[in-house]
């Protein structure tokens, strides 16, 4: 199995094999075909939105480290999305400690979709130029960090530098100790 990094995912890729951590999970969306879950996943190179269905989506939680086998990518409403697919497999291989970056988020780039001039049966996607790109200074990508999250994970999913997270955890521990002493 050939693993790729998240930043190597391109539109209309097939048989994607990669390892990532779940950063966030959106609320379920009920459709007549089933229930859809949107999760934000990342590795040390980038992040991307992934769509999962039904029981699989219900089981996935922020902080889970997952291995995707046989996934695919597609453009949905001009945004790049990662999918498990009918033949894809997701395996939970760990929890909470995994180097990741939140930027760039591959699902935040808008894409133009059009027919491939060399093969009209295929669609191709090219990034749309951003009208604000020239006005904004270039941002350096966030360096990879290993985050250790404590339960409950959703409270720890804020975009805080590691030092601030550690300070916040220490404050929470002190508050818990004070509460225990008062009881």
Curated annotation (Swiss-Prot):
Domain of life: Eukaryota
Region called Disordered, residue ranges: 111-183
DNA-binding region, residues: 21-90
A Gene Ontology BP annotation from the UniProt entry: response to ionizing radiation
Low complexity biased stretches: 132-183
InterPro entries: NA-bd_OB-fold (IPR012340), SOSS-B (IPR051231)
UniProt protein name: SOSS complex subunit B homolog
Organism: Dictyostelium discoideum (Social amoeba)
